[in-house]
C-alpha cells in the first residue's frame, strides 16, 4: 500500500477509503493503532498466456496499420504521377 495506490500481487487495485474507515486507538504502552479500511473494486488479473497473446495481436495490428500507410502512400504517389 502506498499513498496513491494499493498493490496486490504486483498489480495496482482500484480502491477508495471507506466512509468512516479511518480509526486510531491510542495505547498506554506506546504502540498506537491506525486502521484504514479500503473498498476495493472487482479486480481480475491476466494470465501470462493472455498477456503474451494480447501482445502478439497488438504487434500484428501495428504491423498491418504500418503496411496500410506505406501502401496508401505508394498508391497516392502513383495516382499523382499518372493523373
Curated annotation (Swiss-Prot):
Gene: 41
Protein name per Swiss-Prot or TrEMBL: Gene 41 protein
Amino acid at each position: 500500500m502506498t499513498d496513491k495506490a494499493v498493490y496486490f500481487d504486483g498489480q495496482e487495485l482500484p480502491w477508495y477509503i471507506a466512509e468512516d474507515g479511518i480509526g486510531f486507538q491510542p495505547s498506554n504502552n506506546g504502540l498506537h493503532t491506525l486502521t484504514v479500511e479500503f473498498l476495493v473494486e472487482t479486480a481480475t488479473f491476466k494470465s501470462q498466456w493472455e498477456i503474451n497473446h494480447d501482445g502478439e495481436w497488438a504487434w500484428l495490428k501495428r504491423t498491418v496499420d504500418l503496411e496500410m500507410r506505406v501502401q496508401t502512400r505508394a498508391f497516392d504517389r502513383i495516382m499523382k504521377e499518372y493523373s
